[in-house]
């Protein structure tokens, strides 16, 4: 018995009696005479496949356009974030510079502030002492 990959047992099909590779109405296959090639025949009655293919081409075109728009939006967002990051780095450098200047200014004039606070406290205690003496009589 010759070996045919599409037949098994008593001449029955592996596909339960259906022609192999049959996917929908209007499509049928048959083996070419004496070869392993398969011929596909489309019934003219079911010619809506061309319309479906055209519709699929349209959907593919739409998906391609959407993918391109997503790519351009991603590039725009990446450029925006890069620019924002550079602005943030410049702002951080400016803040660090100003804090450094402020710290140096505090260190230079810090002793005078402490002296002023001490003198103010002594003055307040002196005024309170004098006031308490005046109203004690």
Curated annotation (Swiss-Prot):
The family this protein is said to belong to: Belongs to the BET1 family.
CDD domains referenced in this protein's UniProt entry, alphabetically: SNARE_Qc
UniProt function note: Required for vesicular transport from the ER to the Golgi complex. Functions as a SNARE associated with ER-derived vesicles.
This chain belongs to the protein called Bet1-like protein At4g14600
Which InterPro entries does UniProt cross-reference here?
A: T_SNARE_dom
Q: Name one GO cellular component term.
A: endoplasmic reticulum membrane
Q: Which organism is it from?
A: Arabidopsis thaliana
PANTHER family per the UniProt record, alphabetical: GOLGI SNARE BET1-RELATED
Its record classes its membrane topology as: Single-pass type IV membrane protein
Instruction: Give me the Cytoplasmic side stretches, as residue ranges.
Output: 1-113
Q: Which residue ranges does UniProt annotate as crossing the membrane?
A: 114-134
- Where is this gene product found? Golgi apparatus membrane; Endoplasmic reticulum membrane
Q: Where is the t-SNARE coiled-coil homology domain?
A: 43-105
Sequence ranges on the Vesicular membrane side:
135-137
Q: What PROSITE patterns does the database record attribute to this sequence? A: T_SNARE
List UniProt keywords, sorted A-Z. Coiled coil, Endoplasmic reticulum, ER-Golgi transport, Golgi apparatus, Membrane, Protein transport, Transmembrane, Transmembrane helix, Transport
Which GO BP annotation is one of this protein's? vesicle-mediated transport
